[in-house]
Amino acid sequence: WSSDVCSSDLFYYLCGKQPLLPRYAFGNWWSRYHRYTEEEYKELVERFEDEKLPFSVAVVDMDWHIVDDVDPKYGSGWTGYTWNKNFFPDPKGFMSWLHEHNMKITLNVHPADGIRAYEELYPRVAEKMGIDPESEIAVQFDPADPHFMEVYLKDLHHPLEEEGVDFWWLDWQQGTVTKVPGLDPLWMLNHYHYLDSSWKGNRPLTFSRYAGVGSHRYPVGFSGDSVISWESLQFQPYFTNTASNVGYGWWSHDIGGHMMGIRDDELMARWVEYGVFSPINRLHSTDNPFNGKEPWKFDKITQGVMEDYLRLRHGMVPYLYTMNHRAN
């Protein structure tokens, strides 16, 4: 690294630059691991609008798809690609409504279990993979197979994107092994999903975990799941800053903390103050009535701080996007 050029420039020269993010990614993100219904989510968005709290991204966690109603013969509902019509009776209409309210949509997926016979898109995917749909043989997840990846993206994800999904939250947690020694499935997911996400002509984006050096080319990064504690808040700025040593800048943390811990209004206020000045400001929590991140659930001082800072972040979007463009 002995050069007049700084080491980060040399790193990017060797490994590629961080790409330009779409403008909406710089706004506030709403995320919660909670079994929302379509009506509940709409009521939440309308409450945000009534309170003049601007959000640009609607994250819908894994319960958008069928989870508990999966026949045990197919396995668990951890992986899924079929809307739960009990919660979202009109998925296309729901996503169209969010778009009308100036929000982009990302859905959480855990791809490891492949495509099982109960999925709405199974017949189409099975036929493309040379499997008789009547056999109900699962289409195995195989990121090392180019044909599978083509079908996986074009025949499984594209139909959902045509309905309104803007990008995907790839919540991979199943290790680093594929049939090809040394080939990390998360790396393949990040690479192919990111490149494919521009197929409709939009600026590409994915939302996923870190797969090693070089992952900066596939933003945005998901650093969760964080514990609700002062120690977690203390660590996140350090984590974000030192990630620049490997060229990684676009981190999305669980602002406010995801799980465990105790309710602490001051902690929440300080965390949002940090989140607004972190790369991505995504409020997040687990499905617990005591750690939801709606500002009106906190005391008046904390509520005021959260609301002021969320509005501040939204006001910074033109500046952040302009600087991102110049840096790129």
For each feature predicted by the language model, list its residue ranges.
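Catalytic-domain carbohydrate-binding cleft regions of carbohydrate-active enzymes
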Residues: 3-328
